[in-house]
Amino acid sequence: YTGNPYLIEYPDNVMRAKFETTYNLLKEKFGIEVKSHRAGRWAMDDRYFALLKDFGIEADCSHTPGVSWSQAAGETIMGSDYSKVQNYPSFINNILEIPMTIRKTHISRKGSFKHKLRVLLQGDNVWLRPASATADEMLHLCKCIDTEPNVDYLEFMVHSSELMPNGSPYFKDENAIEELYKTIEAVFAYVRQLGYKGITMAEYCRIYKNNN
């Protein structure tokens, strides 16, 4: 193991202190109660869910269905394995886990012929995330999920650093950022046509509890 440590690698007291520092900073800066959470580098365990409960967190979105981080090294462990987790919400220690929108598809409009053939035969995970999927792939993903009976949400992800030129490895200049915003606008326009509307994780959690 040669990577930076995951939060779940630390002893309970250190883990709590680190989380509390971030929690208090966000609460102070935004002036609201923090009710939703995503783990850094997607690493969760039972202790982490218990910690979220202690701080009044209601919703988490750290699970990545069909994706294993077991090749992503921490300092003493590898990353979490979500390859077998369900792709619809469920409660874990009274925290509503709202998995990231990811599905395996067999269509690819980018890459080499060899890559497209592999995706056609084996499938490939497509995220509702511009850093890892094209606009066409995300539109196709949304269309497919809209027909699923157990899922009534789409979870879109973008890091704030990805919204500025060279803030991330994915969008390095002004042109890339312009294309990113066009992609986001296209995806949002399409899902509005499907009947979706933008809400926070905490708002979705309240709706889910009322309906279940």
Labelled PLM ranges:
Residues G123-N212:
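C-terminal domain-boundary segment and adjacent tail
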Residues A39-P149:
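Active-site-adjacent pocket scaffolds in enzyme catalytic domains
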Residues A17, T21-N24, R47, D54, ...:
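Alpha-helical scaffolding segments of alpha/beta enzyme cores, especially the outer helices
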Residues I32-E33, G56-E58, N150-D152, G195:
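Short loop/turn motifs at secondary-structure junctions
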Residues Y1-A43:
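Metal-dependent polysaccharide deacetylase catalytic core of the NodB/CE4 family, i.e.
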Residues H37, D60, L154-F156:
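Hydrophobic residues within beta-strands of alpha/beta enzymes
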Residues V34, N93-I95, Y153:
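Extracellular structured ligand-interaction cores
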Residues K29, V34, R103-S108, N212:
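Charged, low-complexity C-terminal accessory regions
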